[in-house]
Swiss-Prot record:
This is Large ribosomal subunit protein uL13. It comes from Aeromonas salmonicida (strain A449). Coiled coil: none annotated. Part of the 50S ribosomal subunit. One of its GO terms (biological process) is translation. One of its GO terms (molecular function) is mRNA binding. Keywords: Ribonucleoprotein, Ribosomal protein. HAMAP family: Ribosomal_uL13. This protein is one of the early assembly proteins of the 50S ribosomal subunit, although it is not seen to bind rRNA by itself. It is important during the early stages of 50S assembly. One of its GO terms (cellular component) is cytosolic large ribosomal subunit. Belongs to the universal ribosomal protein uL13 family.
Amino acid sequence: MKTFVAKPETVKRDWYIVDAEGKTLGRIATEIASRLRGKHKAEYTPHVDTGDYIIVVNAEKVHVTGKKFTDKIYHSHSGFPGGIKSISFDKLIKRKPEMVIEAAVKGMLPKGPLGRAMFRKLKVYAGAEHAHAAQQPQVLDI
């Protein structure tokens, strides 16, 4: 019996919608990252993007435990000397709530071209409205 290797053109991708309201950030991000990679499928192949599309709504209502709401810091660097910028979780969730979930999921995906392709299948929205009703997403309860 030969080992099965999925081919990118034969992978069937479904659309799922996740409501992040009241859910813990890390627990929801691990499940999303796993679904984006396709690890829930029998035909999972590590070097092929076999994952599904994930829509996350209500990103502004995600929950964090402990003192992370005030103490967690996100860093970015412009590439120039002295170009490091820092922003706390509570300020970032008010300014760009989508970035909180995107940063958590992106850190759990592979680094490189395959990880970037997986990350592009993640759609995050701050509120309850999204622009993907035509894809008829299935509700994913996490």
